[in-house]
Swiss-Prot record:
Enzyme Commission designation: 2.7.7.6
Function noted in UniProt: DNA-dependent RNA polymerase catalyzes the transcription of DNA into RNA using the four ribonucleoside triphosphates as substrates.
Keyword Signal appears in the UniProt entry: no
Organism: Mycobacterium ulcerans (strain Agy99)
Family that this chain belongs to: Belongs to the RNA polymerase beta chain family.
Descriptive protein name: DNA-directed RNA polymerase subunit beta
An example Gene Ontology molecular-function term: DNA-directed RNA polymerase activity
Description of how the protein assembles with itself and partners: The RNAP catalytic core consists of 2 alpha, 1 beta, 1 beta' and 1 omega subunit. When a sigma factor is associated with the core the holoenzyme is formed, which can initiate transcription.
Gene3D superfamilies on file: 2.40.50.100, 2.40.50.150, 3.90.1100.10, DNA-directed RNA polymerase, beta subunit, external 1 domain, DNA-directed RNA polymerase, subunit 2, domain 6, RNA polymerase alpha subunit dimerisation domain, RNA polymerase Rpb2, domain 2
Keywords: DNA-directed RNA polymerase, Nucleotidyltransferase, Transcription, Transferase
Length: 1176
């Protein structure tokens, strides 16, 4: 399947296109796209593939969709088998213990999805389609066949965006990087003798491991299923080999002959018994049971599975069955023998081996971190494995029912129990480490999440055990996994991102495209190569100069060979050439302009921080982009794209109607102010007008973080790079107040608050406006149902939904019984359990959803009514918020200055933001400075003087780049962007402003004036436009102070953390500091009445209220806990006063305490189970 590698063929007849001038607009392939002027010098022969294909293609294989079958037919696969079909074929037939009955499954198919995506999100449903299979029951005694269509449960379906909706939340299944099944040879040095030792592992997809090794005494041994080692000849004899046959095959090897001599087993029977004793110690061995055990371990499909990929890897490594289709996935005798021969030859230092079929294969050890030996389990395979688990559980049930039910009455329906299958699927989507809550901070974060590769998860590595080698960048990652984008913490190197052009082949190996080179001529024929195929070839880089006919200009070309070796070779030796300079990086990394000038550590932070940018009220595309913005935004799926060409018939904020050329009318609904998974605001707005013509694939509405269909994560701000009075020391940032007043960096955040009314033992809870002991002022914004009105401004402690819960009843007095008789249930005691705005939050109510059992809404058991309230908060930029550029340059806002105090340019324009110069040199992210210069050039526009011919520095620029209007948007693709000389030339050629002045000199610096004194600064300052993003680390979410709050149940100390409305811990080291200052009374106060002296803290409150002196502290609760723990160890501990008298710790203080607290209106019953709403 891997042999037919040519998957795309882009031959172009016009020779001038081969190198010539590239198209100057980086967005030219998408209709209606903004005209972004590109500095790219190279033409890319291949469009960026669909960025979600890794998810959608895999799921289509699983369900066996029509589109997948067509693409499989194009690949030359005559009989494609989908993932579900594969599981059913493996499972069928299920036979009973006597073999008289069998049940087989076939033809999986789906009905329509029960509800659309929006309804599933709204009503907490799973976006799923009913799965049906054809089940056939055969009675082998009578030949009777009963066939039925059986329902196998709801099967979660993938949305168009590559996500799943599970119980109303959007989730992503992350692809898993695992070691491929196959045969792996390893080399180690013995510590005592310094001899080279060799070993080999045969690793299956499912089943027992088989390991061979050569030890320091030069004997070849085998370990079966990780049990004790024994001579390898024992296994060969057990497989039926005689001494003569072993001599004939391995006569060339002294170590094999030596092993045979030391082997005491006489023949096959004795060898089998010997193996049985090692595998099943303590059980009486017989020849038959030993034979069955060995066969079941390696040669039976039910117990041992190499999988197609493992079979392919074994065949390739050992040179077996070359060119033949893969049929079996178990081990064969020839595999075992060839593996032993390969190991022996490797140990003896040979470099090649002739396989039984006559194929010569190289003899070498394997690199386990090589991408030829690591494969991807994509979403389809992960779900398939889970279904396989569920089906095997169901198989046991079917077998049992076959033996217990009456043969005449049996039908497929009565045998099958679908519960294990449904449970397995549910468990995977709900709790698996690889099924993750989708990152919806902005469109880029969602797109990156779907393209993520994780080495963690079931069957993968654990972050504690993973060493440096597996985390490191490997030469085989080139074009497959991005070397830049990975997390910074303990998961570094274990989680990666798929490169832009990479794709996954049917075996799960990642392929990357290359242009074929024939006799030194580069063609536009594209070959996709896996990592081990690439090792056999010589590859030139994308920017190797070629002429109009595609020939290399230089006689010697810089290339890379196996294991990342780089050297110059004659052009005739080159086999392939990269398709694009950005081939090696991921989508987020490809959106960093001037990446080639940034240190890799800072580029990593830049790629990661783009995913943390929050959508702003008004998005603005970058002046300096990379040409990746449009494709990333479209493939992320948050913009609206026209399906067909036509004319816009009607436009409003809520929908767009298009009259297509074929006469059909299509209405696209806009998503308005919806809440994303991360509380950001997802809003779509049209960018077309009525009567406008649109083409298929054109963006007609922007989503969050997009402008005109391009990704727009931040704002273009006028930046000055200079120290300013020490206020921007250590990465602090100074902002202009203009950004606050004009809502430049303002974002909207939406919180969802939910409450349900349940049936309790004491009666049903009720959502009502009639709440006990609450004033009318508090209820002013509630409607007659007790639910807050839309548009109400709310702050912490305000009631959103009124709810009362029945209290536990005591024995009623006669008067109460009389009241109950007169007023019925109304006089029952209830307590206020209303939904209130959590501490520290405020905003405007923008939406309410009410679900009720009376309206036939699906609700969990015991819930009668469910209310959701959406509160939106407009957050202006403020001190303490985190801002970042795209080059890993991040900082916290230290000061917001009035615009008139900011440094200003000679024409009076104040800068928006001041960054410190010290943040650049040691971090080596010079890309931010180049971006600042090019940003100024793009904003000002330029005109290159060509009166005396085109200057030398502009020789490679396309003609339309010789001049540009102000406010142009430009792209400088990674590794193929604007050069330093071009930047210097363009800075000297910028257009003057309306006063005829050129404000920034050719070195990119301007004369700045102090906004407070009006005096010029003593030195020129770098000024330009930089793209700045507001990150999700907002000060409003972090700042916190505790008043009266909950206490821990056991220690009675205040809880910690903002979510629990906790206090700040005064820890051991802080106590030392107090001791060092001799602040004894302060320390005593901190450890007693401010913490867990339960009596003291109430008395202190009372003293403060009455204006009296603070009383003496009591005994802390944690001291009493310590005593109890010591007493539980049978130690009699007494507390003595200074004069030696025993102090009695009274237990009965609680009642006095409660009484005193009640008089003061303090509630002491709050403990860790208390919810934050009860604290107001």
């Amino acid at each position: 399947m891997l042999e037919g590698r040519i998957l795309a063929d882009f031959r172009q007849t016009d020779a001038s296109l081969h190198q010539g001038r590239p198209q100057s607009s980086s967005n030219s392939s998408v209709p209606g796209a903004p005209n972004r002027v590109s500095f790219a010098k190279l033409r890319e022969p291949l469009e960026v593939p669909g960025l979600l294909d890794v998810q959608t293609d895999s799921f289509e294989w699983l369900i066996g969709s029509q589109r997948w079958r067509e693409s499989a037919a194009q690949r030359g696969d005559a009989t494609p088998v989908g993932g579900l079909e594969e599981v059913l074929y493996e499972l069928s037939p299920i036979e009973d213990f006597s073999g008289s009955m069998s049940l087989s499954f076939s033809d999986p198919r789906f009905d329509e999805v029960k509800a659309p995506v929006d309804e599933c999100k709204d009503k907490d449903m799973t976006y799923a389609a009913p799965l049906f299979v054809t089940a056939e029951f055969i009675n082998n005694n009578t030949g009777e066949i009963k066939s039925q269509t059986v329902f196998m449960g709801g099967f979660p379906m993938m949305t168009e965006k590559g996500t799943f909706i599970i119980n109303g939340t959007e989730r992503v299944v992350v692809s898993q990087l695992v070691r491929s099944p196959g045969v792996y040879f390893d080399e180690t040095i013995d510590k005592s003798t310094d001899k080279l030792l060799h070993s080999v592992k045969v690793i299956p997809s499912r089943g027992a491991w088989l390991e061979f090794d050569v030890d320091k005494r030069d004997t070849v041994g085998v370990r079966i299923d990780r049990k004790r080692r024994q001579p390898v000849t024992v296994l060969l004899k057990a497989l039926g080999w005689s001494n003569e046959q072993i001599h004939e095959r391995f006569g060339f090897s002294e170590i094999m002959m030596g092993t045979l001599e030391k082997d005491n087993t006489a023949g096959t029977d004795e060898a089998l018994l010997d193996i049985y004793r090692k595998l099943r110690p303590g059980e009486p061995p017989t020849k038959e049971s030993a034979q069955t055990l060995l066969e079941n371990l390696f040669f039976k499909e039910k117990r041992y599975d190499l999988a197609r990929v493992g079979r392919y890897k074994v065949n390739k490594k050992l040179g077996l069955n070359a060119g033949q289709p893969i049929t079996s996935s178990t081990l064969t005798e020839e595999d075992v023998v060839a593996t032993i021969e390969y190991l022996v030859r490797l140990h003896e230092g040979q470099t090649a081996m002739t396989a039984p079929g006559g194929v010569e294969v190289p003899v070498e050890t394997d690199d386990i971190d090589h991408f030829g030996n690591r494969r991807l389990r994509t979403v389809g395979e992960l779900i398939q494995n889970q279904i396989r688990v569920g089906m095997s559980r169901m198989e046991r049930v079917v077998r049992e029912r076959m033996t217990t039910q009456d043969v005449e009455a049996i039908t497929p329906q009565t045998l099958i129990n679908i519960r294990p299958v449904v449970a397995a699927i549910k468990e995977f989507f709900g709790t698996s480490q690889l099924s993750q809550f989708m990152d919806q901070n902005n469109p880029l974060s969602g797109l990156t999440h779907k393209r993520r590769l994780s080495a963690l998860g079931p069957g993968g590595l654990s972050r504690e055990r993973a060493g440096l080698e597996v985390r490191d960048v490997h030469p085989s990652h080139y074009g497959r996994m991005c070397p830049i984008e990975t997390p910074e913490g303990p998961n570094i190197g274990l989680i990666g991102s798929l490169s832009v052009y990479a794709r996954v082949n049917p075996f799960g190996f990642i392929e990357t495209p290359y242009r074929k080179v024939v006799d030194g001529v580069v063609s536009d024929e594209i070959h996709y190569l896996t990592a081990d195929e690439e090792d056999r070839h010589v590859v030139a880089q994308a920017n190797s100069p070629i002429d109009a006919q595609g020939r290399f200009v230089e006689p010697r070309v810089l290339v890379r060979r196996k294991a990342g070796e780089v050297e110059y070779v004659p052009s005739s030796e080159v086999d392939y050439m990269d398709v694009s300079p950005r081939q090696m990086v991921s989508v987020a990394t490809a959106m960093i302009p001037f990446l080639e000038h940034d240190d890799a550590n800072r580029a990593l932070m830049g790629a990661n921080m783009q995913r943390q940018a929050v959508p702003l009220v008004r998005s603005e595309a970058p002046l300096v982009g990379t040409g990746m913005e449009l494709r990333a935004a479209i493939d992320a799926g948050d913009v609206v794209v026209a399906d067909k060409a036509g004319v816009i018939e009607e436009v409003s904020a809520d929908y767009i109607t298009v009259m297509a050329d074929d006469g059909t009318r299509h209405t696209y609904r806009m998503r308005k102010f919806a809440r994303s998974n991360h509380g950001t605001c997802a809003n779509q707005s049209p960018i077309v007008d009525a009567g406008e013509r649109v083409e298929a694939g054109q963006v007609i509405a922007d989503g969050p973080c997009t402008q005109n269909g391009e990704m727009a994560l931040g704002k273009n701000l006028l930046v000055a790079i200079m120290p300013w009075e020490g206020h921007n020391y250590e990465d602090a940032i100074i902002l202009s107040n203009r950004l606050v007043e004009e809502d430049v960096l303002t974002s909207i955040h939406i919180e969802e608050h939910e409450i349900d009314a349940r049936d309790t033992k004491l009666g049903a809870e009720e959502i009502t406006r009639d709440i006990p002991n609450v004033s009318d002022e508090v209820l002013a914004d509630l409607d007659e149902r007790g639910i807050v009105r839309i548009g109400a401004e709310v702050r912490d402690g305000d009631i959103l939904v009124g709810k009362v819960t029945p209290k536990g009843e005591t024995e009623l007095t006669p008067e109460e019984r009389l009241l109950r008789a007169i007023f019925g249930e109304k006089a029952r005691e209830v307590r206020d359990t209303s939904l209130k705005v959590p501490h520290g939050e405020s905003g405007k109510v923008i939406g309410i959803r009410v679900f009720s059992r009376e309206d036939d809404d699906e609700l969990p058991a015991g819930v009668n009514e469910l209310v959701r309230v959406y509160v939106a908060q407009k957050r202006k930029i403020s001190d303490g918020d985190k801002l970042a550029g795209r080059h890993g340059n991040k900082g916290v806002i230290g000061k917001i200055l009035p615009a008139e105090d900011m440094p200003f340019l000679p024409d009076g324009t104040p800068v928006d933001i001041i960054l410190n110069t010290h943040g650049v040199p040691r971090r080596m992210n010079i890309g931010q400075i180049l971006e600042t210069h090019l940003g100024w050039v793009a904003k000002s526009g330029w005109n290159i003087d060509v009166a005396n011919g085109v200057p030398e520095w502009a020789g490679k620029l396309p003609e339309n780049l010789l001049s540009a209007q102000p406010d142009s948007i430009v792209s400088t693709p990674v590794f193929d962007g604007a050069q330093e000389a071009e930047l210097q030339g363009l800075l000297s050629a910028t257009l003057p402003n309306r006063d005829g002045e050129v404000l920034v000199d050719g070195d990119g610096k301007a004369k700045l004036f102090d906004g407070r004194s009006g005096e010029p600064f003593p030195y020129p300052v770098t000024v330009g436009y930089m793209y700045i993003m507001k990150l999700h680390h907002l000060v409003d979410d972090k700042i916190h102070a505790r008043s009266t709050g909950p206490y821990s149940m056991i220690t009675q100390q205040p809880l910690g953390g903002k979510a629990q409305f906790g206090g700040q811990r005064f820890g051991e080291m802080e106590c030392w500091a107090m001791q060092a200052y001799g602040a004894a009374y302060t320390l005593q106060e901190l450890l007693t009445i401010k913490s867990d002296d339960t009596v003291g803290r109430v008395k202190v409150y009372e003293a403060i209220v009455k204006g009296e002196n603070i009383p003496e502290p009591g005994i802390p609760e944690s001291f009493k806990v310590l005593l109890k723990e010591l007493q539980s160890l049978c130690l009699n501990v007494e507390v003595l006063s200074s004069d030696g008298a025993a102090i009695e710790l009274r237990e009965g203080e609680d009642e006095d305490l409660e009484r005193a607290a009640a008089n003061l209106g303090i509630n002491l019953s709050r403990n860790e189970s208390a919810s934050v709403e009860d604290l107001a």
